[in-house]
Amino acid sequence: MLDLLIHNATLPDGRTDIGVAVRDGKIVEVTAGLTPAKAQAHETLDAEGQLLTPPFVDAHFHMDATLSYGLPRVNASGTLLEGIALWGELKPLLTQEALVERALTYCDWAVAKGLLAIRTHVDVCDARLLAVDALLEVKRRV
């Protein structure tokens, strides 16, 4: 049995009556004519012919730095050099818990806006690899 069935959707190429089957949080099928009569699901949504598009993808993100505006202070010049200096000031103050919390918050916000794939970069210049461990924990939870 499916967790979710979205039916009666329209694809960007104009195809109509499209159904999307979701099981265990993953899309398992996208096909024409997939309806509640043909597939049982715990929850069904009628798209009423509305447009169904692929999710947004962020191919370049620094999740270890997300939601850190103002930490330890605002980048007054807005320059890359000051940003790098600020990151150097912030790194000794970072905790794994704070990194995980901010990254998970960002992931929730991203999904709510239709962003379902994020390719992140991470600071590996810290001998502790704190940010790497934090983002591996985020990956495990998400």
Question: What label would you give each PLM region?
Answer:
Residues 1-39:
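N-terminal metal-binding scaffold of metallo-dependent hydrolase/deaminase domains
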Residues 12, 69, 121:
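Conserved residues at the C-terminal ends of beta-strands
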Residues 57-61, 89, 113:
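Single, functionally critical "micro-switch" positions that shape active/binding sites
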Residues 66-99:
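Active-site gating loops and adjacent loop-to-helix segments of metal-dependent hydrolytic enzymes
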Residues 91-142:
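Active-site loop-helix segments enriched in His/Asp/Glu that coordinate
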Residues 9, 25, 49, 60, ...:
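Divalent metal-coordination and catalytic microenvironments
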